[in-house]
Structures are given as C-alpha cells and as structure tokens.
Amino acid sequence: GQAFADAGADIIFIESPESVDEMAEIGRRIDKPLLANIVVGGSTPLLSEKELADLGYQLAIFPGSAFLAMGAAVESVYAHIKTTGSTESLDTPLYEFQAFNQLMGFDKVWAFEKAWLSQD
C-alpha cells in the first residue's frame, strides 16, 4: 500500500486484513486515507465506524450487506407463501407497490416512453 501512497494515490485499500492488529499496523504505516471493505462473513473484522477511525480508517464500504439482506428477505417471503399459500400476515417488511416503482425510477422511464414513443 505504501508504494501506491508514494505514487500519489488519494485513498489506499488493502485487501482483506484478517485481524484488528493487522488493520492497526496498516493504519500506523500508511499516511493516506484508508478504505475498509466490510463484508459480513468475510475475512476482515466487523468493526464500528469509531473502531475503524481509531485504527486510521477514514472510509468504509459495505458492498454485500444489502444483497445478504435481500437474500434473507426473499427466502423468508417465499417460505411464508409456501407454508400459508398467501402473503397475508407476512412479517417481512414490503414496499408499497407505487413507492417501489418510484424508488426504481419507473416514473422517469414511463415519462420518457410517453415523450418519445410513436403514437402510431
């Protein structure tokens, strides 16, 4: 990582440190902003924002967290449907359909279609 810092990198990312001690050593050795990649079930310790800052890390990403949550939600929803035959009394939170469409930007897609598709 130091070679990249010396070459002018703005942020340094060291792949998968496996202990707090290793992360602390990286923080002591490299005088550039450090990026931690936090993956539940990965090699890097799961640390809080404060713990990361104390070790010298200024940035953290959590790239898999939402995917893991989505997987658990999908499994829960379909297990409920399989068991009950319905989504009634589902414990898993769901978006309202229109709110989900807006979240996904479908309103912009539909406006684009309306403006540009032929009326023929």
Segment roles from a protein language model:
Residues 1-79, 106-120:
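Alpha/beta enzyme core
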Residues 30-36, 79-96:
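Short acidic, glycine/proline-enriched helix-loop-strand junctions
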